Amino acid sequence: MNMLEETLETIKAYVALTKPRVIELLLVATIPAMLQAERGENNIGLILLTLLGGWMGAAAANTFNMVADSDIDQKMGRTRARPLVRNKVSNRHASVFAWTLTVVSFLWLWVLCRSVLAGLFILLTIFFYIFVYTKYLKRKTHLNIVWGGAAGCMPVVVGWAVITDNLPAGTPAQWWQAIVLFMVIFFWTPPHTWALAMKYKDDYARAGVPMLPVVRTPVEVTRQIVWYTVATVLTTFLLIPAASWIHAIIAVVSGVWFLVMAVRLHNGIKNGGEVKPLKLFILSNNYLAVYFVGLSIDAVLGWETIGGHLGWTTTFF
């Protein structure tokens, strides 16, 4: 292998440390939050700057996670090809990389995006993801992904903070909408993750990670998936007064679609049929993407909100 090939392999290893596919999903959540926060204004430059700062923060968290989980990754077939397991990058170099991304992400959001609050949210997210979720919850409780999933909800809060810190003085921040979007992802994370964990249950058991499918029956797991799916869909409805009919239609149609598939998985398990949990995992990704794209379109168009049409106070809607 020549020097160029070695350099490319090293770059690929560092990129893999950041879990780029996971980051894509996180960034998908940031865009609609920012568009909704500045409804109709569409400050594309600020959004792009925030996405880059958020990408660095998420990349730092994922890299720290790989360092902390390297012992587990060695035991799981799904993760044995990761860079640290294969010694493509040393733990020390990965840690330096993660710390560098952390500092740059914080300064980026503070200075270039003019939001120290967003920078602090990034630091809080990284701390929570590593020290609360990765080092404790993931290894100690079957509710690991329920509470640990809060870290994955933070991109909407980061994006909202950037917009509100750049709004004209006196403009209502409407943080309740950010909280709703936070809770949408919070409730969505368990069914999304448990569907994948059902597929790789033996892997998690071998690594000693008490994911719900490892410690509960498939019927109980899918029952919980249905309940969290219901909570996800109902939470999206809370935002209906703050958006137009476009969001309302997409929230209802995509929500029913997601719920029907979750119920179908549960009934298939309960009736002893052949089921494919990975289908729900993929569909859950598609559901969230469809919902957030719909919300983004609604916010970009900036049409009158349903709450405004009903004459409710503009302070909230």
Curated annotation (Swiss-Prot):
Query: So what EC number does this one have?
Result: 2.5.1.141
Q: Which InterPro entries match?
A: Protohaem_IX_farnesylTrfase (IPR006369), UbiA_prenyltransferase (IPR000537), UbiA_prenylTrfase_CS (IPR030470), UbiA_sf (IPR044878)
Compartmental location: Cell membrane
Regarding the membrane, this protein is recorded as: Multi-pass membrane protein
Which terms in the Gene Ontology molecular function aspect does this entry carry? Answer: protoheme IX farnesyltransferase activity
Tell me the GO BP annotations in alphabetical order. Answer: heme O biosynthetic process
- What's the superkingdom here? Bacteria
Gene Ontology cellular-component annotations? plasma membrane
Q: Do you know which PROSITE patterns this protein is assigned to? A: UBIA
- Give the reaction(s) catalysed: heme b + (2E,6E)-farnesyl diphosphate + H2O = Fe(II)-heme o + diphosphate
- Pfam families per the UniProt record, alphabetical: UbiA
Q: Which residues cross the membrane?
A: 44-64, 93-113, 116-136, 143-163, 178-198, 221-241, 243-263, 288-308
Q: Does the keyword section mention Cell inner membrane?
A: no
Part of which pathway? Porphyrin-containing compound metabolism; heme O biosynthesis; heme O from protoheme: step 1/1
Q: Which CDD domains match?
A: PT_UbiA_Cox10
| Keywords for this protein | Cell membrane, Heme biosynthesis, Membrane, Transferase, Transmembrane, Transmembrane helix
- Keyword ATP-binding included in the entry's annotation: no
* Similarity field: Belongs to the UbiA prenyltransferase family. Protoheme IX farnesyltransferase subfamily.
Q: Say what the protein does.
A: Converts heme B (protoheme IX) to heme O by substitution of the vinyl group on carbon 2 of heme B porphyrin ring with a hydroxyethyl farnesyl side group.
Question: Other remarks on record?
Answer: Carbon 2 of the heme B porphyrin ring is defined according to the Fischer nomenclature.
What's the protein name? Protoheme IX farnesyltransferase
Q: Which organism is it from?
A: Corynebacterium diphtheriae (strain ATCC 700971 / NCTC 13129 / Biotype gravis)
Source lineage? Bacteria, Bacillati, Actinomycetota, Actinomycetes, Mycobacteriales
